[in-house]
Amino acid sequence: MLTDHRKGAAMHWYHYLAYFFGGAFLSNSLPHLINGISGRSFQSPFAKPPGKGLSSSTVNVLWGFFNLAVAYLLVLRVGSFGLHDIPQVLTLSAGFLLMSVMLARTFGRLHGGI
């Protein structure tokens, strides 16, 4: 157990796990929101086949917003996340970066990127 000295709150390992996955969900929200808001179809888990077929822009906005809501819950409602707490920010950033690279590789194959 770690202690957040700013607030005196105990930081448990599962807080960091939540921040890591919060970063991953935050990263996953971006391509869906950007494509959906731009009116473009994009892959989603609801397409046929899942992750390869295209879903409507509306489905992508809804899926992107769901991912954003999950990121909010994992980052801001678990523990006491602080932007000035370097280990917490690095943990969130690691989840964001790992998911971003995975998404780039996955969608790059479909769109000619990688």
Residue ranges and their predicted role:
Residues V89-I114:
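Alpha-helical transmembrane segments and their immediate juxtamembrane interface regions
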Residues H12-S27, T91-F96:
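Alpha-helical transmembrane segments
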Residues N60-L74:
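Core segments of transmembrane alpha-helices
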Residues G36-K52:
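Cytosolic, membrane-interface loops and tails of multi-pass inner-membrane proteins
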Residues F25-G39:
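Transmembrane alpha-helix/helix-exit interface in multi-pass inner-membrane proteins
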Residues L17, K48-S55, V59:
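Intrinsic-disorder/low-complexity detector
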Residues A71-L90:
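Membrane-helix boundary connector in multi-pass membrane proteins
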Residues M1-A10:
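Short, Lys/Arg-enriched N-terminal segments with co-localized hydrophobic residues
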